[in-house]
């Protein structure tokens, strides 16, 4: 695997060569589903790059966003591949009540509509 914190942006593109994207286990995500999701995000962002659109960066509160954040922001000197897990998600400020869950769904709906 490559040292993603050193070489990749959060949209899975190379830091010094825009338009070149990486995906899968070589980026430091581990697992079939994680590799597939990184390929989907990288492919989506490559199409957006070719169409001169801004990249899609998934919110860090989602597993897709948390994995992309982890592989691009962790310590370069100790970078190790990571599977999807609750440990890479940011802490919630409070216990999630029904109203907050509703707000979370609204935020995700808004994000999806912005794609």
Q: Residue ranges of each PLM-predicted region?
A:
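Generic recognition of stable, solvent-exposed alpha-helical segments in well-folded globular domains
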Residues: 3, 21, 34-38, 62, ...
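Active-site-proximal substrate-binding core of FAD-dependent oxidoreductases
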Residues: 13-16, 47-82
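Short acidic (Asp/Glu) and glycine-rich catalytic loops that position anionic groups and cofactors
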Residues: 18-22, 47-50, 89-92
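Extended hydrophobic-aromatic, low-complexity segments
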Residues: 30-35, 55
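An active-site-proximal "capping" alpha-helix that borders the catalytic cofactor pocket
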Residues: 35-49
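C-terminal auxiliary extensions adjacent to catalytic cores
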Residues: 79-115
